[in-house]
A protein has these predicted regions:
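Conserved pre-motif I regulatory segment
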Residues: 2-56
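Walker A/P-loop NTP-binding motif
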Residues: 31-35, 63-79, 161-166, 195
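Conserved P-loop NTPase motor "coupling/switch" region that bridges the ATPase
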Residues: 78-80, 140, 157-238
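Conserved Walker A/P-loop ATP-binding site and its immediately adjacent core
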Residues: 78-98, 182-187
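Conserved helix-turn-beta segment of the N-terminal RecA-like "Helicase ATP-binding" lobe
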Residues: 88-111, 195-198
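Inter-lobe connector of SF1/SF2 helicase motors
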Residues: 176, 235-274
Length: 274
């Protein structure tokens, strides 16, 4: 993968908040593989009609979040649905509001309710199945920690596929995971289905037949095919010189309602005791 690229995205980042060189290269790769080109002034257009998305597989800590947001903004893929683990929802909201000027982000919770107006909807995997039917059409879909859908028969995986099918023409589908394959190659199939890339591998039956057995030869072949179509991955060791010193931040984590109820009760009991 390239180590840098000259890209501009109108309304993304600021003088103090910019992508690192390898992140720019990752976004440039994604845009190229999805058929988008820049006009040079920060605006991008899909000059080659394509429906396939991308999978950003950088190691943990290399900023897949900002790359995912950059892709959404560059392609103007709003409204977008961003699916992530429950513990990361508020972090995604905060990051989106920092990176994208004027964006309206809504965090969806619970299993019922009306769909508010928003540019980005942040929702966790566990409740997605209850919300999919509320969306008629979307322009962008991002799955964070996309290995959560490694089991294609799980309800969360089926819900993600239904959401992917709601992405309109010219929209984008993006998977983010530092471990897209945890144990065996077949675990990446659902992710490829979500980003509409499974046909690049001959379809589900062909994929199983070619990569079902995790031999060194088949894994090497899969890696080459992924990188040539939809996959970019960098390791920390490869971009160490570009990384800033460690930064510490206080993150607010949304707790499970049932757990928080017990926590509040315990807190009140302690206050009463004191």
């Amino acid at each position: 993968a390239a180590h840098d690229a000259e890209i501009q995205i109108a309304g993304f980042g600021s003088d103090r908040l910019q992508l690192f060189p390898f992140q720019r290269a990752g976004v440039a790769y994604a845009m190229r593989q999805m058929g988008f080109t820049s006009d040079g002034d920060g605006f991008w257009h899909q000059t080659t009609p394509m429906t396939g998305g991308v999978l950003v597989g950088d190691e943990m800590g290399l900023g897949k979040t900002s790359q995912g947001l950059a892709i959404l903004k560059a392609t103007n893929s709003f409204p977008a649905v961003l699916v992530c683990p429950a513990s990361l929802k508020l972090n995604w909201k905060r990051e989106a509001e920092q990176w994208i000027s004027g964006v309206q982000v809504k965090v969806l919770s619970g299993t019922t309710g009306n769909l508010p107006d928003a540019d980005i909807y942040v929702i966790n995997y566990d409740i997605l199945t209850h919300w999919t039917d509320k969306f008629v059409s979307i322009k962008g879909l991002v799955l964070d920690e996309s290995h959560y859908i490694k089991n294609g028969s799980a309800q969360r995986s089926k819900a993600c596929i239904r959401m992917a099918d709601k992405v309109s023409e010219g929209g984008v589908r993006v998977c983010l995971s530092g471990t897209p394959i945890v144990n065996q190659p077949l675990e990446i199939m659902t992710q490829l289905r979500v980003i509409n890339r499974l046909d690049d591998f001959g379809g589900a039956t062909s994929f199983r037949g070619t990569y079902g057995r995790a031999s060194a030869k088949s894994l090497a072949s899969l890696n080459r095919k992924l990188r040539s179509t939809c996959y970019v991955r960098r390791r920390k060791a490869e971009v160490l010189t570009e990384l800033p010193p460690k930064r510490w931040a206080h993150l607010v984590v949304e707790g499970d309602p049932a757990v928080m109820k017990e926590y509040k009760k315990a807190e009140a009991d302690i206050v009463k005791y004191l």
